[in-house]
Regions:
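Ubiquitin-like/PB1-type beta-grasp interaction modules and other compact soluble beta-rich domains
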Residues: 1-76
Length: 77
């Protein structure tokens, strides 16, 4: 059974955004690591990951209905 999440990619990750917009279909139980692979986002480019506003990691799982935000490393000077 397929579910959906709301996904928001920030800054330099925006080119990896799904063509369908923020709503993205997933299989329940998918890990963040697998989601990154589906979106072709290298793991080292996903520095901060939030699920429903709570910091997550690569082994966190999604079941559908969540809001996921992914941020790249921040550089400055």
């Amino acid at each position: 059974m397929e579910s959906q999440i709301q996904i928001k990619l920030f800054a330099t990750l925006q080119p990896f955004a799904p063509e369908l917009g923020e709503a993205y279909p997933i299989s329940p139980g998918i890990s963040i690591r697998s989601l990154l692979e589906q979106l072709n986002i290298p793991q080292e480019k996903a520095k901060l990951i939030f699920i429903d506003g709570i910091k997550a990691n690569l082994t966190s799982t999604l079941n559908g209905g969540e809001r996921v935000g992914i941020f790249p490393p921040v550089g400055g000077g």
